[in-house]
Design a protein with these regions (language model features):
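Cys/His-rich zinc-coordinating modules
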Residues: 74
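An anionic, turn-rich surface loop/hairpin at beta-sheet edges
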Residues: 119-123
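Short capping micro-motif at the N-terminus of alpha-helices
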Residues: 17, 69, 113-114
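N-terminal extracellular ligand-recognition/capping segment immediately after the signal peptide
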Residues: 83-102, 106-117, 147
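Surface-exposed loop/turn motifs in large extracellular/passenger domains
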Residues: 1-18, 26-48, 53-65, 77-82, ...
Length: 185
């Protein structure tokens, strides 16, 4: 789905095949009436990379199932989102807000959280910050980061199921400040 104006995806299945690079290509370059790049995704299954470019582009993800973990960078409102990797992947640090629910199924792959890191203003030192009132499940794979501070800063109800959390340089791979953590293997 390439969008230069206004688009909303509420359902359906979208796959990249052949030479297609992106399942979502959302562009808003100059603020002109025909180049807004405003997109909302509230449902559907999207298998492929997400690409958002341009100073005016905005993407709000409130639902759906994605193979690209960068969907986590665009969580909005009371998002209820599933990520299921189809290969090893890298994405920037991400955060969840109160009311959001995320299921991250690594599907026996490695997800590497890269820079930039996230956190509260002035202390953006986390690979992921899971805020109070959100619910997050990570399962079936390896979460990795080269971050030298905190990989997972947790305030939510968090489940780690059949997970390896690898932060060779981290001060902490998991810091729990609020909420309950359930670790299963």
């Amino acid at each position: 789905v390439q969008n230069h104006h206004v688009a909303e995806i509420k359902g359906g299945t979208f796959n990249t095949t052949g030479s297609a690079q992106y399942v979502v290509d959302n562009e808003g370059h100059n603020g002109a009436a025909n180049d807004l790049g405003q997109m909302t995704i509230s449902g559907g299954t999207l298998n492929g990379k997400i690409y958002v470019v341009g100073a005016g582009a905005s993407l709000a993800v409130t639902g759906g199932t994605f193979s690209d973990p960068s969907a986590l960078l665009y969580l909005s409102g009371n998002a209820n989102v599933k990520i299921r990797l189809n290969g090893d992947a890298t994405c920037n640090g991400f955060k969840t807000q109160s009311g959001q629910s995320v299921e991250l199924d690594l599907n026996n792959h490695v997800l590497t959280l890269a820079k930039p890191t996230v956190g509260s203003a002035g202390t953006e030192t986390n690979s992921c910050q899971l805020l109070k009132g959100s619910t997050v499940t990570m399962k079936n794979g390896t979460l990795a980061s080269d971050n030298d501070k905190i990989m997972i800063q947790n305030y939510c109800n968090l489940t780690l199921d059949a997970m390896t959390v690898r932060g060779l340089n981290a001060l902490y791979v998991l810091s729990n400040n609020c909420g309950n953590i359930l670790i299963n293997n």
